[in-house]
Amino acid sequence: MTELVLVRHGESTANRDNTYTGWSDVPLTAVGIAQAHQAGKRLRATGLQFGAVHTSVLKRAIVTANIMLSEIDQLWLPEYKTWRLNERHYGALRGQNKDVTRQEYGKAQVQQWRRSFYTVPPLLTPAELDHDRRYTKYGAAVEPRGESLKMAYDRIMPYWIDEIAPRLLDGQNQLVVAHGSTLRAMIKYLEHISDTGIDGVEVANGVPICYHLDRQLHVIGKEEY
């Protein structure tokens, strides 16, 4: 049996302020830092040993991962940072307050943007793209103007196939510290959740979710720590 642990980053300033974040690189709050320490302590109590940790290129996930690795005394582990594990890109909604958008566009429309598998949020214009050097080296197509959860799912899965799954098949436990929507996409895949069923899945900040996997990487058990 191999273990896959998924953890959403601790509370960010955008979580605290109730704004859409996406690829905006916001820091953790003091609460988020405490959540990361607590997640690490809960993981330490399990005694799990990991082969590698995977995270995004956004600081809220990277800092959470490093705090957790310190708590479990495994800071020496290989740490793989990839844009493919970035949060879903919320397009022109980024930085906007969620309550304000509900008032402006209506609750039903906002719910579709946030939770639907296929609905794409309002897009950034080409002029509004950041052209961040973290992404430009991969080509213009990498930095999206906005994404549905399906689009995020499609960019995550190649990383799962090429980097995470082979290590699990080799018997190495893996730790993934990422974001709410991207972890929902991975959970959809692992648990075979339908396109409509995924809208009800929530991932809390700083709560380790451990999947027990058989030799074919089928889920045979699940725990939250």
UniProtKB/Swiss-Prot annotation:
Which parts of the sequence are marked as the site Transition state stabilizer? H179
Q: What's its EC?
A: 5.4.2.11
Its pathway is:
Carbohydrate degradation; glycolysis; pyruvate from D-glyceraldehyde 3-phosphate: step 3/5
Q: Catalysed reaction(s)?
A: (2R)-2-phosphoglycerate = (2R)-3-phosphoglycerate
Family, as annotated? Belongs to the phosphoglycerate mutase family. BPG-dependent PGAM subfamily.
Pfam family for this entry, one: His_Phos_1
Role according to the record: Catalyzes the interconversion of 2-phosphoglycerate and 3-phosphoglycerate.
The residues the record assigns to binding substrate are: 8-15, 21-22, 60, 87-90, 98, 114-115
Active site per the UniProt annotation: H9 (tele-phosphohistidine intermediate), E87 (proton donor/acceptor)
Molecular function GO terms recorded: phosphoglycerate mutase activity
Membrane-traversing stretches? none
Q: State the InterPro entries in the record.
A: His_Pase_superF_clade-1, His_PPase_superfam, PG/BPGM_mutase_AS, Phosphogly_mut1
Domain of life (superkingdom): Bacteria
Under PROSITE patterns, the record lists:
PG_MUTASE
- What's any GO biological process attached to this entry? glycolytic process
Name of protein: 2,3-bisphosphoglycerate-dependent phosphoglycerate mutase 1
Q: Which UniProt keywords apply?
A: Gluconeogenesis, Glycolysis, Isomerase
Q: Which organism is it from?
A: Lactiplantibacillus plantarum (strain ATCC BAA-793 / NCIMB 8826 / WCFS1)
Checking SMART domains in the record gives:
PGAM
